[in-house]
């Protein structure tokens, strides 16, 4: 059963994200002293008493300005109200009542859901009552003086809020595949997200840096549940100003760590850039499965050989993630977007796959028969005793050897390539752990192994 939703509405910079973090007891929403930080609507799980719900943080509402993002933000706020059971209208107790507050209040009075009025920045309990009193004239009922920073008054607000939430039975945990959508700014991540789920969930604009938060969307396909995380575009550090974009990029890196599969989006018009290569390395370092999505394929002039030539070029630039599957799509037209989910399923399955010790050692035996470990200058040869998979997500194989130093990097790559050739693991990195072990210890453990090389 889906959680009931609470929408947070208000002017820019009244402290909506601070309140979201307070209610959700987290710091997921970006908080920075700059208007317009939150542009998309972002979802956080929250609890009060015995109730669980989702808090939706929306962008700052401005009705008398149609500059670039503002109409899109209004559209997002309206979408949040449509799906919400109750809304919290946040105003600034220190600034006092403004014309912008009155415009929003007039708009909210036309909505069909309950509205609670939260007067934020009332850090002083005694002065807070006076600050809140001026907002009675908005005609939205009793104003609650609260402090998003310190938490003053939020208990009373939540006590009232949960009375408006629909009754709900026991919430069951669903198995979700967590997918981070990452890439450089303006490669079409939000457009892909919207095309994938069939609604305008994230703001889409030709200006780089539109998405600043990491945004979660839960969707179901063919009986499976997916959590999609649309992240801020990642660019070179020297091009990143300290502030909201800096926090957003760090949130994107955190999203990669949260995910199981990374949907790595590349702009077909730009090809693979140096920053794309660095981002791919980040995915490998964090040990995440990956699907390479080449977007804007509709904008490329093609002949019968274009897709083959282009894939070869991308592969040559991203040779270190040769294990990732690739798909060419257009978020604008929707072409092939529906096929991405099959690649994600394959990558997720391989990411958590386990292989028996006997099969691993059969691969090792075959590999060693074709290419035995090298011998060093002192005439000492490396010896692989046996291997076993110690964990998944990503698949990690421990190789017990006489001395790890006797296995140079080129031979380690050879062994890894043999595992890929025989075991697959398409879409996921493989980690090999080279562990030194004395021959006597190996003999003692032989009885516990299915096969010995």
From Swiss-Prot:
<keyword id="KW-0690">Ribosome biogenesis</keyword>
<dbReference type="InterPro" id="IPR031166">
    <property type="entry name" value="G_ENGA"/>
</dbReference>
<keyword id="KW-0547">Nucleotide-binding</keyword>
<dbReference type="InterPro" id="IPR027417">
    <property type="entry name" value="P-loop_NTPase"/>
</dbReference>
<dbReference type="GO" id="GO:0016887">
    <property type="term" value="F:ATP hydrolysis activity"/>
</dbReference>
<dbReference type="InterPro" id="IPR005225">
    <property type="entry name" value="Small_GTP-bd"/>
</dbReference>
<feature type="domain" description="KH-like">
    <location>
        <begin position="353"/>
        <end position="438"/>
    </location>
</feature>
<keyword id="KW-0342">GTP-binding</keyword>
<feature type="binding site">
    <location>
        <begin position="183"/>
        <end position="190"/>
    </location>
    <ligand>
        <name>GTP 2</name>
    </ligand>
</feature>
<dbReference type="InterPro" id="IPR006073">
    <property type="entry name" value="GTP-bd"/>
</dbReference>
<feature type="domain" description="EngA-type G 2">
    <location>
        <begin position="177"/>
        <end position="352"/>
    </location>
</feature>
<keyword id="KW-0677">Repeat</keyword>
<feature type="binding site">
    <location>
        <begin position="295"/>
        <end position="298"/>
    </location>
    <ligand>
        <name>GTP 2</name>
    </ligand>
</feature>
<feature type="binding site">
    <location>
        <begin position="120"/>
        <end position="123"/>
    </location>
    <ligand>
        <name>GTP 1</name>
    </ligand>
</feature>
<dbReference type="GO" id="GO:0042254">
    <property type="term" value="P:ribosome biogenesis"/>
</dbReference>
<comment type="function">
    <text>GTPase that plays an essential role in the late steps of ribosome biogenesis.</text>
</comment>
<feature type="binding site">
    <location>
        <begin position="10"/>
        <end position="17"/>
    </location>
    <ligand>
        <name>GTP 1</name>
    </ligand>
</feature>
<dbReference type="InterPro" id="IPR015946">
    <property type="entry name" value="KH_dom-like_a/b"/>
</dbReference>
<dbReference type="Pfam" id="PF01926">
    <property type="entry name" value="MMR_HSR1"/>
</dbReference>
<dbReference type="InterPro" id="IPR003593">
    <property type="entry name" value="AAA+_ATPase"/>
</dbReference>
<comment type="similarity">
    <text>Belongs to the TRAFAC class TrmE-Era-EngA-EngB-Septin-like GTPase superfamily. EngA (Der) GTPase family.</text>
</comment>
<dbReference type="GO" id="GO:0005525">
    <property type="term" value="F:GTP binding"/>
</dbReference>
<dbReference type="Pfam" id="PF14714">
    <property type="entry name" value="KH_dom-like"/>
</dbReference>
<dbReference type="InterPro" id="IPR016484">
    <property type="entry name" value="GTPase_Der"/>
</dbReference>
<feature type="binding site">
    <location>
        <begin position="230"/>
        <end position="234"/>
    </location>
    <ligand>
        <name>GTP 2</name>
    </ligand>
</feature>
<protein>
    <recommendedName>
        <fullName>GTPase Der</fullName>
    </recommendedName>
</protein>
<comment type="subunit">
    <text>Associates with the 50S ribosomal subunit.</text>
</comment>
<feature type="domain" description="EngA-type G 1">
    <location>
        <begin position="4"/>
        <end position="169"/>
    </location>
</feature>
<dbReference type="InterPro" id="IPR032859">
    <property type="entry name" value="KH_dom-like"/>
</dbReference>
<dbReference type="GO" id="GO:0043022">
    <property type="term" value="F:ribosome binding"/>
</dbReference>
<feature type="binding site">
    <location>
        <begin position="57"/>
        <end position="61"/>
    </location>
    <ligand>
        <name>GTP 1</name>
    </ligand>
</feature>
């Amino acid at each position: 059963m889906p959680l009931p939703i609470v929408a947070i509405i208000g002017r820019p910079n009244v402290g909506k994200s601070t309140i979201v973090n307070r209610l959700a007891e987290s710091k997921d929403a970006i908080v920075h002293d700059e208007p317009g930080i939150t542009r998309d609507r972002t979802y956080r799980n929250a609890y009060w008493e015995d109730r669980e719900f989702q808090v939706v943080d929306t962008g700052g509402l401005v009705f008398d300005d149609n500059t670039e993002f503002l109409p899109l933000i209004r559209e997002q706020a309206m979408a949040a109200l449509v799906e919400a059971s109750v809304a919290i209208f946040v105003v600034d107790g220190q600034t006092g009542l403004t014309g912008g507050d009155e415009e929003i209040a007039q708009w909210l009075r036309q909505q069909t859901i309950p509205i609670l009025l939260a007067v934020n920045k009332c850090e002083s309990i005694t002065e807070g009552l006076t600050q809140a009193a001026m907002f009675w004239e908005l005609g939205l009922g009793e104003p609650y003086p609260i402090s998003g920073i310190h938490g003053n008054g939020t208990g009373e607000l939540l006590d009232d809020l949960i009375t408006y939430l629909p009754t709900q039975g026991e919430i069951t945990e669903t198995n979700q595949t967590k997918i981070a959508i990452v890439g450089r700014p303006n490669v079409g991540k939000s457009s892909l997200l919207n095309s994938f789920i069939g609604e305008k969930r994230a703001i889409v604009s030709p200006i780089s840096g539109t998405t600043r938060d990491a945004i979660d969307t839960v969707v179901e396909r063919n009986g499976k549940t997916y959590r999609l995380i649309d992240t801020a575009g990642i660019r070179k550090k020297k091009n990143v100003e300290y502030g909201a974009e800096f926090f957003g990029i760090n949130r994107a890196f955190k999203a990669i760590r949260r995910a199981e599969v990374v949907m790595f989006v590349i702009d077909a018009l730009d090809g693979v850039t140096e920053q794309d290569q660095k981002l791919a390395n980040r995915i490998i370092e964090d040990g995440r499965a990956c699907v390479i999505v080449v977007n804007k394929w509709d904008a490329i002039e093609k002949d019968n050989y274009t897709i083959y030539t282009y894939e070869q070029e991308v592969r040559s630039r991203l040779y270190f993630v040769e294990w990732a599957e690739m798909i060419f799509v257009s978020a604008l037209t929707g072409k092939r977007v529906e096929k991405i989910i099959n690649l994600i399923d394959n990558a997720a399955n391989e990411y958590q796959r386990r292989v028996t010790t006997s099969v691993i050692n059969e691969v090792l035996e075959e590999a060693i028969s074709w290419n035995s470990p090298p011998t060093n200058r002192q005439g000492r040869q490396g010896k692989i005793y046996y291997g076993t998979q110690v964990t998944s997500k990503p698949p990690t194989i421990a190789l017990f050897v006489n001395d790890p130093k006797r296995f140079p990097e080129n031979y380690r790559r050879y062994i890894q390539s043999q595992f890929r050739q025989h075991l697959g693991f398409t879409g996921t990195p493989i980690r090999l752990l080279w562990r030194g072990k004395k021959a006597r210890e190996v003999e003692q453990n032989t009885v516990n192994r299915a096969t010995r090389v």
